[in-house]
Regions:
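Short, Lys/Arg-enriched, Trp-marked, Pro/Gly-tolerant hinge/linker segments that flank
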Residues: 119-135, 152-158, 167-198, 202, ...
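Terminal helix-turn-helix DNA-binding modules in bacterial transcription factors
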Residues: 194-202, 207-212, 230-272, 291-299
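Helix-turn-helix
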Residues: 212-221
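N-terminal regulatory/effector-sensing and dimerization cores
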Residues: 2-118
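Key DNA-contact positions within bacterial/archaeal DNA-binding proteins
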Residues: 222, 272, 287
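Short hydrophobic/aromatic patch on the recognition helix
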Residues: 224, 228, 273-274, 278
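A long, hydrophobic alpha-helical segment
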Residues: 139-154
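Core residues of bacterial helix-turn-helix
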Residues: 216-217, 266-267, 278
Length: 299
């Protein structure tokens, strides 16, 4: 497997599968990443994204599109902006990259009853629209679930089988009957959600309500709720709690501050309520988390 791109927040690994087809593994724990180093060279490239964990934002032809766990997004690579964002700062997924000009006309000619033609798949999904999103589908989910843990001893052969299986399902997938979900937002709505998220970060140690934030931005509560849910995939209050607990976890790992002090810095004047909130997000108490993860200071 070839490492395509790596930095502290983002890693992409590419595995050649067939001529013109590669399987790219993505892992991210940051806000955004630029895919220029992993960008396809051909103008006629189809990219099939699958999200396993987290959430990804893509700008496709000027529209902001979002994929969540189980979603499948198909688009022509030339329409996708090089920078992708991860609203939850956490993402794991795959891209099947298909260079239509370099792939054989028929990938499965050795199998008489299997007719897989990448050119026809590209036409099926991206001839009328810039992209196509399939919500969590059991058939596709089964195929991708096995792609994430391929044993090294059979990696090359197994990847070929799974990609061929994916292409076969895409070849017969009924795009007319399937519910087509754009999952796209206008830039103004995306900007509002991200501005509110930045406001939350600047006021980490304060307690505030949705109504107060709505007044601060001069919009309705409903507008913020809808924008926030669309961009981040969670509610306004769930995002606040999750982000506070992530920052609290970082402080538990990298500082020797008492738990009660960390709780206060994140808007909790009651350490028991803080511990309960922390456990609901991280699965363990703050004290246990520190014992298991502390890096710079003795327990």
């Amino acid at each position: 497997m070839q490492r395509v791109q790596e930095n502290p927040d983002y890693t992409a690994w590419a595995q050649p599968v067939f001529p013109g087809i590669a399987l790219i593994h993505l892992s991210a724990h940051g806000k955004a990443a630029c895919l220029e180093e992993a960008a396809p060279v051909s103008a006629d490239v189809l990219e099939i994204f699958h999200c396993r964990e987290g959430r990804m934002e893509l700008n496709i032809g000027g529209e902001y599109c979002y994929v969540s766990p189980g979603d499948l997004l198909i688009a022509r690579a030339r329409k996708i902006a090089s920078e992708v964002c991860f609203p939850l700062r956490h993402y794991h997924g795959l891209i099947v990259r298909v260079d239509v000009q370099q792939t054989p006309h028929c990938l499965s000619c050795i199998l008489q009853d299997v007719n897989v033609q990448p050119q026809l798949i590209a036409k099926r999904f991206c001839s009328r629209r810039e992209y196509f999103i399939v919500r969590s589908n059991p058939s596709f989910e089964h195929i991708f679930s096995e792609m994430y843990a391929i044993p090294d001893a059979i990696k090359e052969g197994f990847a070929k089988i799974k990609v061929l299986e994916l292409m076969l399902f895409l070849s017969v997938f009924d795009t007319q009957e399937a519910e087509w979900s754009r999952l796209s937002l206008p830039p103004s709505q995306v900007h509002l959600a991200k501005s509110v998220a930045a406001y939350q970060l600047d006021h980490m140690g304060e307690r505030y309500t949705l109504n107060q934030v709505a007044k601060e931005f001069g919009v309705s509560c409903t507008c913020i709720k809808n924008s926030f849910k669309a961009v981040y995939g969670v509610s306004f209050y769930a995002f606040i709690k999750a982000r506070k607990m992530e920052y609290a976890a970082y402080m538990l790992e990298h500082t020797d501050k008492p738990v009660v002090e960390i709780a206060g810095e994140h808007g909790y004047d009651n350490s028991s309520k803080f511990a309960s909130a922390f456990r609901s997000v991280k699965g363990v108490s703050p004290g246990t988390y520190r014992q298991q993860n502390q890096k710079n200071y003795p327990a």
